[in-house]
UniProtKB/Swiss-Prot annotation:
Residues that bear Phosphoserine: S23, S28, S30, S31
Gene it is expressed from: Csn2
Gene Ontology CC entries for this record: extracellular region
Signal peptide: 1-15
Name the UniProt record assigns to this protein: Beta-casein
Alphabetical list of PROSITE patterns matching this protein: CASEIN_ALPHA_BETA
Residues modified to Phosphothreonine: T26
InterPro entries cross-referenced by the UniProt entry: Casein (IPR001588), Casein_beta (IPR016345), Casein_CS (IPR031305)
UniProt note on tissues of expression: Mammary gland specific. Secreted in milk.
Organism for this UniProt entry: Mus musculus (Mouse)
Keywords: Milk protein, Phosphoprotein, Secreted, Signal
Function of the molecule: Important role in determination of the surface properties of the casein micelles.
Pfam families, per the entry: Casein (PF00363)
């Protein structure tokens, strides 16, 4: 029994020694780590201080080099330019008199060219003036006559009907005595010559006028009493 108690005491003593050694070792390790961390911080501070000092030295060199260079534009040492006043007794420069131009100046070459052109090219002939007799002859050649209706080989009743329509227009003759029909009658007669072959034989004057107004509304046909024409 005593032996067992002694063994327990020895074991407890050994356990205490091991815990003490372990704690001491951990304390030493933590102290070493803290020392290393402190050393690293010191090194970083030293490096930062060295960089700041190097930058300060560089800036000082640059500033000193800028101050040592001479100024490109020394305005302070610039001398004033002397300006002598112009004397008032100087006469103005004489200018040539201005002659007003009366028109474009033609060169001798252009004048000779125009003269040569006038001699080579013939002048245009003037158109003769038309007198009243010439105009009347031209109009008379274009105005149809009542005899032209008979040349269309129409029935006698239709020819008489067309003649009545022509005679219903006002008798406003031209100046010349050779014309037998007025201008309105000539227009109607020309129009009747175009439509006469297509008209029926038994037709009153009123029906014919209405038919002609439908064909040509631009011509104003006079109103005549309604009666038929027999052969």
């Amino acid at each position: 029994m005593k032996v067992f108690i002694l063994a327990c005491l020895v074991a407890l003593a050994l356990a205490r020694e091991t815990t003490f050694t372990v704690s001491s070792e951990t304390d030493s390790i933590s102290s070493e780590e803290s020392v290393e961390h402190i050393n690293e911080q010191k090194l970083q501070k030293v490096n930062l201080m060295g960089q700041l000092q190097a930058e300060d030295v560089l800036q000082a060199k640059v500033h000193s080099s800028i101050q040592s260079q001479p100024q490109a534009f020394p305005y302070a040492q610039a001398q004033t330019i002397s300006c002598n006043p112009v004397p008032q007794n100087i006469q103005p420069i004489a200018q040539p008199p201005v002659v007003p131009s009366l028109g474009p100046v033609i060169s001798p070459e252009l004048e000779s060219f125009l003269k040569a052109k006038a001699t080579i090219l013939p002048k245009h002939k003037q158109m003769p003036l038309l007198n009243s007799e010439t105009v009347l002859r031209l109009i008379n050649s274009q105005i149809p006559s009542l005899a032209s209706l008979a040349n269309l080989h129409l029935p006698q009743s239709l020819v008489q009907l067309l003649a009545q329509v022509v005679q219903a227009f006002p008798q406003t003759h031209l100046v010349s005595s050779q014309t037998q029909l007025s201008l309105p009658q000539s227009k109607v007669l020309y129009f009747l010559q175009q439509v006469a072959p297509f008209l029926p034989q038994d037709m009153s004057v009123q029906d014919l006028l209405q038919y002609l107004e439908l064909l040509n509304p631009t011509v104003q046909f006079p109103a005549t009493p309604q009666h038929s024409v027999s052969v």
